[in-house]
Amino acid sequence: MVFKTLRRTLWLTLAALLAVFQFNLGAAQAAELTAETRTVKLNPQGDNVTLSLKQVAEGKQLFAYACGQCHVGGITKTDPNVGLDPEALALATPPRDSVESLVDYLHNPTTYDGEREISELHPSTKSTDIFPKMRNLTEDDLVAISGHILLQPKIVGTKWGGGKIYY
């Protein structure tokens, strides 16, 4: 009986340590990114923005919370032909390859060709009744998430949006 209790306590302690390590690892990884790496496209006009270390860490966490269920690794589970890789984002109509255009998409999602509004099918600030994880996301949160999406190809390369061949 004592052995079972000891073993259970050991496993719980190990799980807690791993959780703490995982949480702190994201902040440590963000701190290692240079300003050049953290610079992403701000708008369709081609202006750039350098994400703060806080935005990078929050973007990663918020993406995992609100988007990761369907977009882990930059893929789209419901449509493997459309990912979050730079090429797919640039070829969307309108292009979704900047922070401002991704934030717009999170407010007003449309099909890849831009012809139909899909807020009832894709999480957005319009559909918080259907997708409650979007309820409490602020504009700053949406900017951080968008920055995370644009930053990932610089960090993980072609793995981001690459699909099953990488994960």
UniProtKB/Swiss-Prot annotation:
Task: Give the note describing cofactor binding and stoichiometry.
Answer: Binds 1 heme c group covalently per subunit.
Regarding the membrane, this protein is recorded as: Peripheral membrane protein
GO cellular component: a single term: photosystem II
Query: How far does the signal peptide extend, from start to end residue?
Result: 1-30
Q: Where in the cell is it found?
A: Cellular thylakoid membrane
Determine the domain of life of the protein's source.
Answer: Bacteria
Q: Please name the SUPFAM superfamilies in this protein's record.
A: Cytochrome c
User: What keywords were assigned to this record?
Assistant: Electron transport, Heme, Iron, Membrane, Metal-binding, Photosynthesis, Photosystem II, Signal, Thylakoid, Transport
Q: What is its main location?
A: membrane
Cofactor(s) in the UniProt record: heme c
Residues at which heme c binds: C67, C70, H71, H122
Question: Gene3D superfamilies, alphabetically?
Answer: Cytochrome c-like domain
Q: Single GO molecular-function term?
A: electron transfer activity
**GO terms classed as biological process:** photosynthesis, light reaction; respiratory electron transport chain
Q: Which family does it belong to?
A: Belongs to the cytochrome c family. PsbV subfamily.
Q: Assembly state and interactors?
A: PSII is composed of 1 copy each of membrane proteins PsbA, PsbB, PsbC, PsbD, PsbE, PsbF, PsbH, PsbI, PsbJ, PsbK, PsbL, PsbM, PsbT, PsbX, PsbY, PsbZ, Psb30/Ycf12, peripheral proteins PsbO, CyanoQ (PsbQ), PsbU, PsbV and a large number of cofactors. It forms dimeric complexes.
The function of this protein is: One of the extrinsic, lumenal subunits of photosystem II (PSII). PSII is a light-driven water plastoquinone oxidoreductase, using light energy to abstract electrons from H(2)O, generating a proton gradient subsequently used for ATP formation. The extrinsic proteins stabilize the structure of photosystem II oxygen-evolving complex (OEC), the ion environment of oxygen evolution and protect the OEC against heat-induced inactivation. Low-potential cytochrome c that plays a role in the OEC of PSII.
Q: What is this protein called?
A: Photosystem II extrinsic protein V
Its source organism is Synechococcus elongatus (strain ATCC 33912 / PCC 7942 / FACHB-805)
Q: What would be the name of the gene that encodes this protein?
A: psbV
